[in-house]
Regions:
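Core structural elements
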Residues: 65-70, 92, 173, 209, ...
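Substrate-binding beta-hairpin/strand module that engages nucleic acids
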Residues: 123, 259, 263, 377-378, ...
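Conserved P-loop NTPase motor core
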Residues: 1-625, 630-642, 692
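Short amphipathic alpha-helical coiled-coil/interface segments
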Residues: 23-26, 41, 45-52, 62-73, ...
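Arginine-glycine-biased low-complexity disordered regions
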Residues: 618-676, 681, 687
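Acidic/negatively charged segments and metal-coordination signatures
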Residues: 664, 693-932
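Structured DNA-binding interfaces in DNA transaction proteins
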Residues: 446-491, 673, 677, 686, ...
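Conserved phosphate/pyrophosphate-binding and hydrolysis machinery centered on Walker-type P-loop NTPases
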Residues: 16-19, 34-42, 55-66, 82, ...
Length: 932
């Protein structure tokens, strides 16, 4: 089958031929565009924008648009996009993935398709893996876009809704996948349309597309609200778990050394000692029989497996996970008495994110910090379904071809390998494999010292904060100066990475994926010039303007720009000399301390094309990847070799085993992602329906007609259910009266007319009750209008309230269904199909409950007389008393004469965003102050 696949797949050369022709068309425009003045070049944007919004296809505008960006980049950034960058840009515009090696200039590549697609006026999102890159790229590339007459926005954590809305309204918007996803969810929770911040999802260019669309796809985005449960049980469960003894599987000694298949065929009985055991491959923990007995005794329950003790069991299991599986300074860090998640792919702290399902609370109990209340899911979506909403999606990465099947299957994205501008001249050395971690770390330190002594810069890659700090301590003991970049030292990230290629530099970094800052051999003159200006007292804003190319600036900025240019030129001389010196030493040496579970992360660490350098991994048999996923052959090989811990093994013997372990891990993670998506696809259909209906309400759809339909539906369903018997004498009219009496029909209209109703057919009963209900609703509207309420606004508000409340309950119910649905497989039933069928029934129930809640609120909710409230509010604000009853007025006057006149302090007029004093719960500007 493989040869057929190869036969049907066009060669890379054939795929690139039409792209080369388009690149030729762009090149042909360069002489003409070079002659344009800055103003004439800017005017090109207005011309192209008018043509695009007039209906001309973007494909026809591509050569001119790309040529404009290239010329602008030469003038503003001092960089001319290479031909391969233009080809990469064309691929992105076509809605495909451009695989471009590290160092090929992906940031500048994205500028061309972003500019082209922004001409339509529908917005372009450039998605980065972290806030730092969004801010950095937004500022750097913003200089180019603004020069060409485009607006640029950056979405960062901590912005106000107004700032976010302004950023999204720009032609081009930079932001992280997290921020974009959460803003989408928040937009579908607002009560007023003007509070929404995002526009439609038009075109997205995803940087490090494999990290975002594949690695992070296992974790859904969740917006949570605080739950109501006490946190005491987390602390109690933690105290209990700390008393338990971890058990191990006891294998049959007669079958020791045999493969798992042989042991299974021989019927091996596996015993587990201790109170609990951990499956590291599945990252799960389970109580043994001994552990269950201890739990029952400790918590005073008879049977832990009783359904009534499910919640207690959940607390215990989460405490076990927190203590036996989750590692401090690997999975999370503790800062400022808070447990903070470390992103396993980037090594950064995930600010504001919490583990779900009570795990975060269990970790807080373990670390003896304040245990926050367990959260409740308010809204959720997976990255897969979020990014599939874009009309056009594309991405860039250095490593995507190996995952092409997943990109095509889930996102319908093809991968195109872009040839490198410079040949790959990095030297990748064989792995050094040690039997123990201890021996490996000693060898790593010795290798660093050996290379540092020559002046060669060394970048050490680790996969956890814990290992980076261990190596840092070992280097300090040996007197080696170095920098550490991890989740605890992220503030100086740009400075540390920028100087990692300096002569003699030693840098320890956790997960280099998506660092985004160039490592220049010999040092970075731009960074050095900026650093000097900061030391001299220049403000960051002045430095940013000074390093740009805008002509409309003050004399202060022009002076700062001249100073920056002078400093950069001086440092450039130094770094050029240092560059040649470092190249002579072999360039930057990359030293990996452990193989990552993804081969792509390893390749990203290995570094850039075009720069001379070398890379090597130091690994041990005790590393998690080999220990958990290495398989039986790796364990047998390790035990048979029996070498001492300081002697490296022949890596060639183990290369295939290591690669197989990584492939197994990648395959397992792919299955997890597929599994997550299969379930979320079911939820996504329901989410789209709810959000679509919600948006229609926000955009002013006639809600009144919907309310009437709801009343009709509820009455019709109730009559059909209670009057289903062919014999009218057996109709359950009492039940019908009880049900509709809690909604929209007075019970006496049914119980007081039973004989009449039994003479009618079901359609006639429905029509009669509907007419009664609608007449009551008309009177209710008259009453509430007299009270000063807008009935259409109340309908809108009550409907949104009901939808939001029931949708949250539905999410919880779906989570519970999903947690237990896997057990259906034991009954030979497909869990996915079972989930689909049950979730459909649950969705129907939710829709019915929304109808009931909305109608009940509109008919029966106690709503204050707003006019009376307003009179009282006016009296409170002005110090007057609006009393109509003359006797009451006389009584008040008499009381006033007796007590003497007392000054009344008039309250200040409420601000537009203050709560309205009438008590409606709305902001003043949306209530009594609406007409001001």
């Amino acid at each position: 089958m493989e040869w057929i696949k190869k036969l049907l797949t066009p060669s890379p050369e054939k795929l690139l031929k039409p792209l080369y022709r388009q690149a030729d068309a762009i090149d042909a425009l360069e002489p003409t565009y070079e002659k344009l003045t800055d103003d004439q070049l800017r005017e090109k944007t207005n011309e192209l924008r008018a043509r695009a919004q007039g209906g001309e296809e973007l494909d026809k505008l591509l050569p001119e648009a790309f040529a404009v960006v290239r010329e602008g980049s030469k003038r503003v950034l001092g960089m001319r996009p290479f031909r391969v960058q233009m080809i990469g840009g064309i691929v992105l515009h076509q809605g495909r993935i451009a695989e471009m090696k590290t160092g090929e200039g992906k940031t500048l590549t994205a500028a061309m398709p972003a500019y082209l697609n922004a001409l339509s006026g529908k917005g372009v999102h450039i998605v980065t893996v972290n806030d730092y890159l969004a801010k950095f790229q937004g500022e750097e590339m913003g200089k180019l876009y603004r020069f060409l007459g485009m607006s640029v926005g950056v979405i960062l954590n901590g912005l106000t809704p107004e700032q976010r809305k302004a950023a999204y309204s720009c032609d081009i918007t930079y932001g992280t996948n997290n921020e974009l996803g959460f803003d989408y969810l928040r937009d579908n929770m607002v009560v007023y349309k003007e509070n929404m911040v995002q526009r439609e999802h038009n075109f997205a260019i995803v940087d490090e597309v494999d990290s975002i669309l594949i690695d992070e796809a296992r974790t859904p985005l969740i917006i949570s609200g605080q739950g109501e449960k006490s946190t005491d049980m987390y602390e109690k469960a933690d105290r209990f778990v700390c008393r338990l003894v971890r058990g191990e599987k006891k294998e049959d000694p007669e079958l020791a050394g045999q493969s798992s298949t042989v042991r299974r065929l021989m019927g091996e009985q596996v015993e587990i000692d201790g109170d609990y055991w951990v499956d590291e491959k599945e990252k799960s923990a389970t109580l043994t029989e001994a552990g269950v007995e201890k739990a029952e005794k400790y918590f005073g329950v008879e049977n832990l497996s009783d359904p009534e003790n499910n919640e207690l069991y959940h607390y215990i299991i989460q405490a076990l996970k927190a203590n036996a599986i989750m590692k401090r300074d690997v999975d999370y860090v503790v800062q400022d008495n808070q447990v903070m998640i470390v992103d396993e792919f980037t090594g950064r702290i995930m600010v504001g994110r919490r583990f779900s399902d009570g795990l975060h609370q269990a970790l807080e109990a373990k670390e003896h910090v304040k245990v926050e209340r367990e959260s409740r899911t308010l809204a959720t979506i997976t990255y897969q379904n979020f990014f599939r909403m874009y009309h056009k999606l594309s991405g860039m990465t250095g490593t995507a071809k190996t995952e092409e099947a997943e990109f095509q299957g889930i996102y319908a994205l093809d991968v195109v390998q872009i040839p490198t501008n410079k040949p790959m001249i990095r030297k990748d050395l064989n792995d050094m494999v040690y039997t123990t971690k201890k021996g490996k770390y000693r060898a790593v330190v010795e290798e660093i010292i050996r290379r540092h002594a020559t002046g060669q810069p060394v970048l050490v890659g680790t996969i956890s904060v814990e290992v980076s700090e261990l190596l840092s301590h070992m280097l300090e003991m040996r007197g080696v100066p170095h920098e550490v970049l991890n989740a605890k030292h992220h503030a100086r990230e740009a400075a540390i990475v920028a100087q990692a290629g300096h002569y003699g530099a030693v840098t320890i970094a956790t997960n280099m994926a998506g660092r985004g800052t160039d490592i220049l051999l010999g040092g970075n003159p731009d960074y050095m010039a900026r650093r000097t200006m900061r030391q001299e007292g220049y403000e960051d804003e002045i430095i940013e303007l000074a390093t740009g190319h805008n002509e409309d600036v003050t004399d202060v900025v022009l002076a700062a720009r001249a100073h920056y240019t002078q400093l950069r030129a001086e440092y450039k001389k130094e770094t050029d000399v240092a560059h040649d010196r470092v190249v002579a030493l072999g360039g930057l040496h990359i030293l990996g301390t452990e193989r990552h579970e993804s081969r792509r992360i390893d390749n990203q660490l290995r570094g850039r094309q075009g720069d001379p350098g070398s890379s090597q991994f130091f690994i041990s048999m005790e590393d998690d990847l080999l220990r958990i996923f290495g398989g039986e052959r790796m364990k047998m090989l390790s035990s048979r070799l029996g070498m001492d811990e300081d002697t490296p093994l022949d890596a060639k013997l183990l290369t295939s085993q290591i690669e197989n372990a990584q492939k197994r891990m990648e395959s397992r993670n792919y299955e997890i992602r597929k599994h997550v998506l299969q379930y979320d696809d079911v939820m996504n259909q329901q989410r789209e329906l709810i959000y679509k209906q919600r948006r229609q309400v926000l955009e002013g759809e006639n809600v009144h007609d919907n309310i009437v339909s709801m009343i009709e539906q509820l009455i019709g369903d109730a009559v059909a259910h209670e009057c289903s018997n062919p014999d009218p004498a057996l109709w359950q009219l009492d039940s019908l009266a009880d049900y509709l009496g809690r909604l929209c029909v007075p019970p006496t209209e049914i119980t007081g007319h039973e004989d009449e109703l039994r003479k009618l057919n079901k359609d006639q009963i429905k029509e009669r009750l509907l007419n009664i209900s609608l007449e009551l609703y008309r009177k209710r509207e008259e009453q509430l209008t007299a009270y000063g309420h807008d009935m259409r606004e109340l309908e809108r508000a009550f409907l949104l309230h009901s939808v939001d409340r029931r949708w949250m309950d539905h999410i919880d119910a779906m989570d519970q269904l999903r947690d237990g649905i896997g057990l259906r497989a034991f009954a030979q039933r497909d869990p996915i199909n079972e989930y689909k069928m049950e979730s459909y029934d649950m969705f129907e129930d939710m829709v019915r409950l929304i109808r009931e809640d909305t109608v009940r609120l509109l008919f029966l909710a106690h709503i204050e007389d707003r006019n009376a409230q307003r009179r009282r509010a006016v009296a409170a604000i002005t110090g007057t008393n609006d009393v109509k009853n003359s006797s009451a007025m006389e009584k008040a006057a008499k009381s006033s004469r007796q007590e003497g006149a007392r000054p009344v302090k008039a309250d200040k007029k409420p601000g537009r965003n203050d709560p309205c004093p009438c008590g409606s719960g709305k902001k003043y500007k949306n209530c009594c102050g609406r007409n001001e």
